[in-house]
C-alpha cells in the first residue's frame, strides 16, 4: 500500500479529490464547535487536502500517513501557505501509536483501505481524549462498490468499541465517484464514551 500511494502522490490533488476534501472540510466545520480550541489528528491525511484548511482554523493538526511522497506534498503546500500549526509524521499508528491524545480525529476516504477495522477503531479510541470525536468520511457499500461500508454495520462496530452519540449522513452521491461507479460519500461522527 505504501508504494501504491507514493506513486500517486504527485497526481493526487485532482479536481475530484479537491472537491471531495472540501465537502468533508465543510461538514467538519458544521459538526464541530470551536474548532479553534481543537487539536486534530488527520489519519492517512495524504497530501493535506483536509489537514491544511483545518489547520487554518484549529489549534493544531497532526497529519499522519505511511506514504513519504504524500507527506512531501503536504509539507510543501504548508510552506507555500505559511501554515505553522501542523506537524507531519510518517508512521503506522497500528504498529507504533503516539503518546499524544487528540480532541478530534478525521479519517477521510482512508478507512476502506484498512485491513483490520477492529484494530483501527481501537487505535482511534486510544488516541482520543475523553469526549473526543472521530469523524469518518468514506463510501457507502453497494453492489458495485464492495470497498465501502454499510452504515448500520459501521455504527454498530463503533458502539462495540466504546463510541457513543453516533450519527451518519450522506454528503454527496454521483456517477463515477469511486472506481468508475456511482457512489455515495458519507460522514459518520462518534464520541469516545466515558465508560471505557
Where on the chain are the PLM-derived regions?
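Conserved beta-strand signature within the Rossmann-like core of class I S-adenosyl-L-methionine
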Residues: 132-139
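A conserved beta-strand element that flanks and buttresses the S-adenosyl-L-methionine
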Residues: 106
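Core SAM-dependent methyltransferase catalytic element
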Residues: 174-196
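Short alpha-helix
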Residues: 147-162
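Conserved class I S-adenosyl-L-methionine
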Residues: 1-35, 38-44
Amino acid at each position: 500500500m505504501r508504494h501504491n500511494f507514493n506513486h500517486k502522490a504527485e497526481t493526487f490533488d485532482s479536481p475530484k479529490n479537491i472537491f471531495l476534501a472540501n465537502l468533508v472540510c465543510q461538514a467538519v466545520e458544521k459538526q464541530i464547535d470551536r474548532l479553534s480550541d481543537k487539536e486534530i489528528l488527520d489519519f492517512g491525511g495524504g497530501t493535506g487536502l483536509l489537514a491544511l484548511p483545518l489547520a487554518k482554523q484549529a489549534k493544531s493538526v497532526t497529519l499522519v500517513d505511511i506514504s513519504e511522497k504524500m507527506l512531501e506534498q503536504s509539507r510543501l503546500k504548508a510552506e507555500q501557505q505559511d501554515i505553522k500549526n501542523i506537524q507531519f509524521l510518517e508512521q503506522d499508528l497500528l504498529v507504533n501509536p503516539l503518546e499524544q491524545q487528540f480532541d478530534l480525529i478525521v479519517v477521510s476516504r482512508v478507512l476502506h483501505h484498512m485491513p483490520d477495522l477492529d484494530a483501527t477503531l481501537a487505535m482511534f479510541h486510544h488516541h482520543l481524549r475523553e469526549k473526543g470525536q472521530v469523524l469518518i468520511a468514506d463510501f457507502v457499500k453497494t453492489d458495485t462498490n464492495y470497498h465501502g461500508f454499510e452504515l448500520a454495520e459501521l455504527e454498530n462496530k463503533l458502539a462495540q468499541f466504546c463510541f457513543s452519540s453516533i450519527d451518519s449522513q450522506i454528503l454527496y452521491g454521483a456517477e463515477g465517484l469511486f472506481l468508475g461507479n456511482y457512489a455515495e460519500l458519507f460522514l459518520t461522527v462518534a464520541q469516545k464514551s466515558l465508560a471505557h
